[in-house]
C-alpha cells in the first residue's frame, strides 16, 4: 500500500536470551524461561542485500530490539508489487532439553534436534496497522506473512532431515557432509 524504506524482521529465537522481555517476564525454569542457565538468542553476523542483476552485494545494518529487528534499505521497496531480496546469516544454540518447538532430545535410536519455525522472517505488514512489531513473549501464536524462503542446511551425512517444502539441491561438501 505504500513504499517501504525499511523492513522489520521477527527474531523470536531471542526470547531465549536471558535479558529478553519474555525471559524476564516468565522467569527461570518455566516453559518460556531459560532453564538450567541456558542463554539463547540469535547470532546474526550479516544481512546482505542481493542484487537481482548479479551486481555487487551490499551489507545491511540490522538494529535488534528484543524479538524484532529493523533493516533500513538503501532504496525503498516500491508499493504494490515491489520486491527486495536479502539474505540473513544466522545461528543459535539449542538448549539441551526440549523447549517450545526446539531443543535436543536423546532417544534410544540417537538424538533428535528440533528447530521448527525458529528462523528470521519479515514481520507482517498491512495497510491498517502497518508493521506488526509486537515482541514475541512466548505464549500464544505469532502473526506472520506467507512467503517463499530458501533455507540452506548443512548436516552430517548420517543425519535425517525432516522438513516441509521442496528439496532444491542435494550436495556433498568437501568434508563429506550433505548440504
Report each predicted region and the residues it spans:
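Ligand-binding face of N-terminal immunoglobulin V-set domains in extracellular IgSF glycoproteins
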Residues: 1-22, 31-33
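Short Gly/aromatic-enriched secondary-structure transition segments
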Residues: 5-12, 23-26, 103, 166-172
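Extended, low-hydrophobicity, Ser/Thr/Pro/Gly-biased non-transmembrane segments
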Residues: 31-46, 50-52, 61, 72, ...
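Short strand-edge motifs at loop-to-beta-strand transitions and within beta-strands
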Residues: 67-71, 82-84
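Short Pro-Gly-centered flexible turn/kink motifs
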Residues: 78-88
Amino acid at each position: 500500500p505504500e513504499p517501504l524504506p525499511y523492513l522489520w524482521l521477527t527474531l523470536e529465537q531471542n526470547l531465549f536470551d536471558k535479558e529478553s522481555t519474555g525471559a524476564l517476564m516468565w522467569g527461570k525454569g518455566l516453559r518460556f524461561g531459560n532453564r538450567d542457565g541456558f542463554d539463547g538468542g540469535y547470532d546474526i553476523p550479516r544481512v546482505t542485500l542481493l542484487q537481482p542483476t548479479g551486481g555487487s552485494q551490499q551489507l545491511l545494518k540490522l538494529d535488534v530490539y528484543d524479538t524484532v529487528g529493523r533493516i533500513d534499505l538503501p532504496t525503498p521497496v516500491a508499493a504494490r508489487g515491489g520486491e527486495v531480496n536479502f539474505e540473513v546469516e544466522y545461528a543459535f544454540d539449542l538448549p539441551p532439553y526440549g523447549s517450545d518447538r526446539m531443543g535436543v532430545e536423546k532417544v534410544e535410536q540417537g538424538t533428535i534436534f528440533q528447530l521448527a519455525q525458529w528462523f528470521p522472517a519479515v514481520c507482517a505488514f498491512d495497510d491498517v496497522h502497518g508493521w506488526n512489531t509486537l515482541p514475541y513473549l512466548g505464549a500464544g501464536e505469532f502473526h506472520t506473512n506467507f512467503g517463499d524462503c530458501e533455507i540452506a542446511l548443512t548436516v552430517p551425512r548420517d543425519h535425517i532431515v525432516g522438513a516441509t517444502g521442496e528439496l532444491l539441491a542435494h550436495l556433498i561438501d568437501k568434508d563429506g557432509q550433505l548440504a
